[in-house]
Amino acid sequence: MITKKPTQGSQEQTAHAASKRMKKLSEYGKQLQEKQKVKNMYGVLEKQFRRFYKIAAKSQEAAGERLLSLLERRLDNTVYRLKLTISRAQARQIIVHGHVLVNGKKVYSPSFLVSINDEISLAPNVVSKTEFLERVVDKRLNIGVKVPEWLELNKKDRKGRVLRLPVRSDIQVPIEEHLIVELYSK
């Protein structure tokens, strides 16, 4: 009777397969991953994210929902949601350069929080640049991306208005905000 000896290659395969297995993520790892996902999505650095969390934690409503509402209300996010730019980074850039007006006044801070009935528009010098409008604004307006219910967009004038404050149901991205709250409440 012939018995087969395990070959050197089969031992290498099992050792290699073991290193490829995913390790189970710890609870802290899940919380950190969720926080990083939200920070990256909104383009916010840690210091400002923590500041928003402190504001959210002091409010009467659920801290996680309030945090997301505050992040949604940032001017750079609002300009992006109104489809006036292709990305939040581009929205941040045109805000810093003074190309966005809130209630007729230039605002240079992307972290500016919009309020109910605020009117957001592009500055006249941007509106006169048809290349930007054709390449960015009109293209985005025509691809069928919907403006959230908490905002109103006048496509003709390229102006938006805040109808109400955003709520959790307005955010379509799957976010487990309770993990972020657990992380910061330690």
Predicted regions, residues:
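Short, surface-exposed recognition loops or helix-turn segments adjacent to catalytic cores
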Residues: 89-93, 105-110
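Short, well-ordered loop/turn sites that connect or cap secondary structure elements
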Residues: 85-88, 94-95, 114
